[in-house]
């Protein structure tokens, strides 16, 4: 995944990766729409997941279309963009791009 000109690789054996406003998160954002521990990415049972633990939800756009989740999880596959708390067309600077292959 990449964001803010940084690239981070999440491998199958890695623990979960947190995304949010907290400085403890791997991907940190300052938007008021992003929760302190907004979402986490992890590998489980042969697939990558994004689990949303936020107030405002997470938008994911990939090869299958756009999905909105809040307080739930979704399989992340292919390539695409993740936006925290606001629709993708409102958050160009705070987007996370991903490729799973």
Segments (PLM) and residue ranges:
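Generic structural signal for coil-to-beta-strand starts
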Residues: 46-47, 81
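Short, charged beta-strand/loop "edge" motif centered at a coil->beta-strand transition
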Residues: 14-44, 89, 94-95
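Well-ordered beta-strand positions
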Residues: 11, 40-42, 49-51, 75
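C-terminal boundary/linker segments immediately following FHA domains
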Residues: 12, 54, 60-101
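Residue-level detector of conserved, well-ordered beta-strand and adjacent loop positions
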Residues: 20, 51, 61
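A short beta-strand micro-motif
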Residues: 1-3
């Amino acid at each position: 995944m990449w964001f803010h000109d940084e690239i981070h690789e999440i491998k199958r054996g890695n623990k979960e990766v947190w995304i949010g406003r907290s400085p403890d998160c791997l991907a940190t954002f300052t938007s008021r729409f992003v929760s302190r521990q907004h979402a986490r990415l992890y590998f489980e049972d042969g697939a990558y997941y994004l689990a949303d633990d936020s107030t405002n939800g997470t938008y994911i756009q990939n090869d299958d279309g756009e999905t909105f989740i809040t307080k739930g999880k979704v399989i992340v596959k292919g390539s695409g963009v993740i936006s925290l708390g606001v629709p993708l067309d409102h958050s160009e600077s705070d987007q996370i791009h991903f490729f799973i292959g």
